[in-house]
Every structure is written in C-alpha cells, then in structure tokens.
A protein has these predicted regions:
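N-terminal secretory/targeting leader peptides
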Residues: 1-13, 22, 30-237
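Phosphate/pyrophosphate-binding betaalpha-module
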Residues: 25
C-alpha cells in the first residue's frame, strides 16, 4: 500500500507521515510477525525510465514495460496501458539490450548506477511512488540482548533525518552527473497530473486486494496528510 501511486505529494509530507504515524504502526505490525523494526531505509521516489521519452501516460500505452513482482507495480502498469513484462531486477539490463522491454519504473538509486541508465537513458520525473525498505531483526533475539547491545546496534545506523538527507543528495548528484548521460525530463504540472489521473483507481484496488488493515492504514495516511497541510497553512500551531 505504501507504494501506491501519488500516495504522498512530496518527500517532506512523506517524512511527516512516516515519523508521526507509520513508524510506530509498522513497529507494532512487524512485532506481531516476530520482527523488530530497527530503521527505515529510503529508496526514494520512483519515476519512469525508457529508451525513448515518455512524458505522459499515452506515451507508455503499448510499451513493453518491466514490472517487479509487487502488486502495486502491476496495477500501475495496467492503469497506464503498458504492455506488462514481469522481470526480476537482475534481468532488466539484458532485457533492455535485447528489446524485450522498452521502459519501466524505479528510483534514481536503483536506476542511475546499475546499468539501466546506459540502456534506457530517458528518465521522466513522474515521482509517482515513494519507496522505502526496512531493516529488521528477529524480535526474540532482539529482546534477549542486553540493553547496552541493543543501544550499540541502534546507534550504528545514522539518524533517519541524516540518511534521508544523504540519499536525496546522492539522487540529485546522480541525475546531474554528466558522465552518466541521463536525459532527465522534468514534467509540467499538467503532465504529472495526467499520470495521477491515469492511476487514480490503483490505491483503492490495492486496498481491496491487500485486505487486512490496508484501509485503516490508508485512513491514517489521509489523516497525516491533512495534518501536514494544516501545519503548512498555520505553521505556528
């Protein structure tokens, strides 16, 4: 659900919602699976890469579009009318070279320096899905550790604010690096809105297919978005 298209408007809004609501919630959800959440690791916003420019969803219609095994990836590709090609990450470069695929979606960190950019240099900043991963430990093992050892392990990771800053700085640096020869395509508001409109039903589809607490989590995210917007309007509150 957290990868639903346009679930978050920007990174700062996502930061607020993760810090205020989602971290505690997912710590509890993971604990129920005998996992202890150590920290989040930001992957970054996903955008669309391709061998030729894809500026609006109509440009992606019928394109051989690589998707991962995740449900959100398949539903997004269906929504924009792409020809869906499920592939593992390690198959992307060779599939671009042979023409099996023409496009796909990924974050800058998983695109710029992995060989994908060499074969599909056009990168359109749809910024449609905010990616994160988690670093976890076996909870039974974690709970049995002395407090001092838990503190050492926790402190071995940089503060989330610092890891976010470094990740975003690296993404920007990669996109601007002339040696990578990435053709970055910023989108106008109208172009980006076209992606939003095309994928507008995906979140509800995800909620229905995922079941469980997905709808409650979505409601919590909407609450966080409203709070964040209110804080921007009334920053003194």
């Amino acid at each position: 659900l957290l990868y639903a298209p346009f679930l978050f408007d920007d990174a700062e809004q996502a930061d607020y919602i993760y810090d205020t609501y989602l971290t505690d919630l997912y710590r509890d959800l993971l604990a129920a699976q005998n996992l202890h959440l150590l920290t989040w690791y930001e992957i970054g916003f996903q955008s669309v890469y391709a061998t030729t420019p894809i500026m609006v969803p109509a440009d992606a219609r019928g394109k051989r579009f690589r998707v991962s095994s995740s449900l959100n990836a398949r539903l997004f590709a269906e929504a924009i009318g792409a020809d869906i090609i499920p592939l593992g990450f390690g198959e992307i470069v060779s599939s671009l070279q042979t023409g099996l695929i023409e496009a796909g979606e990924n974050s800058v960190s998983l695109y710029a320096r992995t060989g994908i950019a060499d074969e599909a240099p056009h990168f359109s900043l749809t910024l449609h899905a905010f990616g994160v991963s988690v670093i976890v430990a076996d909870k039974k093992w974690w709970d049995a550790l002395p407090a001092e050892d838990r503190a050492v392990l926790t402190d071995s990771f940089p503060p989330i604010s610092e890891s976010r800053r470094l990740s975003r700085a690296q993404d920007l640096s990669d996109l601007m690096d002339p040696s990578l020869e990435i053709v970055v395509h910023p989108l106008s508001d109208d172009q980006r809105n076209a992606w939003r409109v095309a994928s507008i039903d995906v979140t509800e589809q995800l909620i229905e297919k995922l079941g469980g607490r997905a709808r409650d989590i979505y409601a919590l995210i909407l609450k966080g978005k409203a709070e964040y917007q209110g804080n921007q309007v009334n920053p003194e509150l």
